[in-house]
Amino acid sequence: MNIKFSPSLMTMDLDKFSEQIGFLKDKVDSFHVDIMDGHFVSNLSLSPWFIEQVKKVSDTQISAHLMVEDPSFWTDRLIDIGTDFICFPAETVNGIAFRLINKIHSSGLRAGVVLNPETSISSIESYIDKLDKITIMTVDPGFAGEIFIKKSLEKIVNLRKEREKFNYHFLIEMDGSSNKKSFSMIHQANPDIYIVGRSGLFGLSSDIETSWQEMIKNFETETGVKVNQFVNRE
């Protein structure tokens, strides 16, 4: 089964940047980069500059998750550097969503939206047909290691039904505490992409290869699904 993992680079060991990116780039579907402004969430994280550094050593897709009050400001910079997916918070785009999506698509890139645990699918229904990806937060955003919110998985199930019914093309991604304890529950909801961070991948060992193999073992043990460990992009 083609399980897609997207490592959250906010939780990687930056002292081992080249080593960890080099090992993961042929094994994962994409890299997940959190960009926070300290206002939408009470934290600061990675930046467009960081994405540029990743792109210098890897051609793996990069998905930027904006946790910012002004997504338009950040989107312009992310377009300039060719970020594959630009995903903005649903809570901040009322009145600019169509304009923002059109700008991203006009640049040949893909647009996504992120739903926090309290945010309903109905809030994006007016533009859901234009989205390339929908990310469901299964934790409160802003910090690694937050408590897993099982109820958020219902949105994944409902999005799959809606996608099939209306023939939408968006990918469904989950973000938050994806690890040995939650893999089985998440798999039952069946997202297209699993974002894995400290508890699911990077924190399992100081050695990235050991961490990766442990994550794969945990996933296969908890779900009964065999993981293809090499991504063929040809």
Q: Where are these predicted regions, by residue range?
A:
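N-terminal active-site wall of soluble small-molecule enzyme domains
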Residues: 32-103
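Catalytic cores of alpha/beta
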Residues: 19-24, 70-80, 119-130, 177-194
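Glycine/Thr-rich beta-alpha phosphate-binding loop at enzyme active sites
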Residues: 37-45, 49, 117, 125-157, ...
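Hydrophobic faces of well-ordered beta-strands that scaffold small-molecule active sites
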Residues: 3-8, 31-33, 62-66, 86-88, ...
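Glycine-enriched alpha-helix->loop->beta-strand junction motifs that scaffold or abut catalytic
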Residues: 27-30, 57-60, 79-86, 105-112, ...
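Active-site beta-loop-alpha junctions enriched in small/polar residues
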Residues: 8-12, 36-38, 67-71, 91, ...
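Glycine-rich phosphate-binding active-site loops on the catalytic face of alpha/beta enzymes
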Residues: 86-94, 135-147, 189-212
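C-terminal helical cap(s) of enzyme catalytic domains, especially alpha/beta-barrels
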Residues: 201-234
